[in-house]
Amino acid sequence: LDEEKLLKTISRIQKDIWIGINNYLSPLEQMNVVNQTLFSHYQFLGLNNDDDELRYMYINNAVDALKGNHFAIGILYLCLCQQLDLPVYGVCLSAHFILARAKDYITDFDNKEENREEVLFYVNPYNKGLAFSEKEINIYLNKIGAQPSDKYFAPASNRQVLFEYVQYLI
């Protein structure tokens, strides 16, 4: 792991996003700037399950190769947004990692029902930052036979996200 190289690359991507973001953009427009930078300018790709090799589960390899699985791409996206002070949080959706764009910053992650109401829309970083709503989450949960629960809709703390990521890796 070349930590210095990784941090320089992430910093460069962050600066490229920062150049395009201003306070006059709507939350959706801000996410579009992130998407354009990551997926058009840098050409990051989400790998399908067949290509989901172990090395692409790690953020450093995903950054080097410009491709990764849903967690690696999602955590990179999350880190970039949070470094830019955008209220974006991880959501651990039954075997998928998505992001939530909130109205404002969340400090108490224990009240999942209240935090769920703070979500403006969801982002699928694995699918080029596609924005979607609770409706699509409900369709997905129905498809896999899972019961809807606030935990599948509410933003999670970074600690919770890292816990899920480690569980995914082992």
Give, region by region, the residue ranges found by the protein language model.
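A structural boundary/capping signal
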Residues: 1-169
